[in-house]
Amino acid sequence: MKSVHSSPQNTSHTIMTFYPTMEEFADFNTYVAYMESQGAHQAGLAKVIPPKEWKARQMYDDIEDILIATPLQQVTSGQGGVFTQYHKKKKAMRVGQYRRLANSKKYQTPPHQNFADLEQRYWKSHPGNPPIYGADISGSLFEESTKQWNLGHLGTILDLLEQECGVVIEGVNTPYLYFGMWKTTFAWHTEDMDLYSINYLHFGEPKTWYVVPPEHGQHLERLARELFPDISRGCEAFLRHKVALISPTVLKENGIPFNCMTQEAGEFMVTFPYGYHAGFNHGFNCAEAINFATPRWIDYGKMASQCSCGESTVTFSMDPFVRIVQPESYELWKHRQDLAIVEHTEPRVAESQELSNWRDDIVLRRAALGLRLLPNLTAQCPTQPVSSGHCYNPKGCGTDAVPGSAFQSSAYHTQTQSLTLGMSARVLLPSTGSWGSGRGRGRGQGQGRGCSRGRGHGCCTRELGTEEPTVQPASKRRLLMGTRSRAQGHRPQLPLANDLMTNLSL
């Protein structure tokens, strides 16, 4: 195993790049543990370049008709390297249409000499011409034959959320696709519940990432409260809204340590718990992302604070994680007497016997159901899609997070779309022996936020003087369902334009 490092910006922790062999690439959990043993988590972000013989997908020439149900125009305001961002919903379009739009004269990447030159152009371009992001599309472009690092079934302990509580949250424990163009941006945030995340750039132009080491996350939060006082007064964890852009120059001027890394096609980026990150796309591209967890994350999950205004709430019960991964702390935790202490530099946590037993039990249950022994084939399948804002919890798992934390985590918020079921249809649809397609409708206007009980409250803001709806980023769709019916390896289609165009409410 070998790795290289990026050049740090005012920090002693560097972004490491790893080059696993095919043998090392076979076990996702083991390799993540190795990365942390090398200190990769201390920077908050790491790059993994897969072996040359590995492929996520053989060809990408068959995705032109995938539907982007709710493209989002990203409008920024501000000056001096400090900006806020909001989204305006645009009409649905196919990926082929989006590609042509991204490469048009109006939206194409400007001429530049190198990545550093393009980065300067990016920050100088704000507010400027607002780009359109094809974000938060439920689905996966990984082929079923891809066994290693397939984002649809990584096989981490985040599977406990679905297997023990029957909870599915799109974009958290199911993959999301992101079609980007020049200047499309993800603002400063940490992941929902301070989870890990993994992002694979399938094809296209690069993506630039900024990251603040987890041990300096509170420093960034303090600076953000000073730079955005009006927003911060309305919410204790307003960075969860994913609206704040802060340039590298401003970070340097205020002594905030950070790193920068460019991701190119065919590369993975892994974010670590409580690692604030932001970035932008260099041009037309397609990325896929999902959250995951390791035993080291449990204490972060216990302490993850939540959005206090209700704009962006994604939370779930920590009960199965503490009970199975930290059985020695379970009774204290139930009585709120377990004082978790997060150690940002601790590389890994020993696995409990209960967790080992759980892993063995999953293998036995899959075998009994006649399932293929993939690392994470755990799809729950009610007979009908679950509508946004409604829930069914068969096991009675609570969803209240234990309160009390000095940390202000931020959510990886998403814009709720009309309910187009892509790879999440693997979770939502029964296996019928043929490919399935799901249909449904969201509540529109960015409504249907997930909350601690799975209820959608709905929230929308409208910019004065415009006819198009503007939306604040909403949380990912939360789906609770039975845990008995399982998918049997049949891969449903991503949403196609002909399937859903007539059902859209725009």
Swiss-Prot record:
SMART domains: JmjC (SM00558), JmjN (SM00545). Fe cation binds at residues 189, 191, 277. Residues 143-309 form the JmjC domain. InterPro entries: JmjC_dom, JmjN. It is found in: Nucleus. Its EC number is 1.14.11.66. Its main location: nucleus. 2-oxoglutarate binds at residues 133, 199, 207, 242. It catalyses: N(6),N(6),N(6)-trimethyl-L-lysyl(9)-[histone H3] + 2 2-oxoglutarate + 2 O2 = N(6)-methyl-L-lysyl(9)-[histone H3] + 2 formaldehyde + 2 succinate + 2 CO2. Zn(2+) binds at residues 235, 241, 307, 309. Residues 432-473 are annotated as: Disordered. GO terms for biological process: chromatin remodeling; regulation of gene expression. The keyword Metal-binding applies. Its cofactor is Fe(2+). Residues 435-453 have a biased composition (Gly residues). Histone demethylase that specifically demethylates 'Lys-9' of histone H3, thereby playing a central role in histone code. This is Lysine-specific demethylase 4E. It comes from Homo sapiens. The gene is KDM4E.
